[in-house]
């Protein structure tokens, strides 16, 4: 049996967790730059993953605490996908990936790190972005720091979609 191994995620798995839901707490803090919240819509928000599978790994989550896809309200589901489309545009123009994975892990057994608050992963991909480093050195190479990626994607968001950049400031 083959196993998928992501040793760089160990930091996330072993980190001390604050009580309550990460997504709810982070959205309420209103410290978007510090928390890497790239964008806030009416029903959903976009956040950079602190433990990325690749540079530019984004997550889109509803503000409302909901753990099941079938429990999302129609307006949440619609906005989640519209914002995801915008994220793909800014990733393509800002980071120039050769492909993009979109996916949800529904439930703990499917691999969800935060199983009780639904979120969509958007992961840019490049030819050869998987290599021997995670296996031999237990290290995942992410070539650009989170703060630089945040600034770059924020700039792309403002360039591509003026409507979104004028909504509630993300630099609180």
Q: Which role fits each region the language model picked out?
A:
Residues 1-172:
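HIT superfamily nucleotide-processing domains
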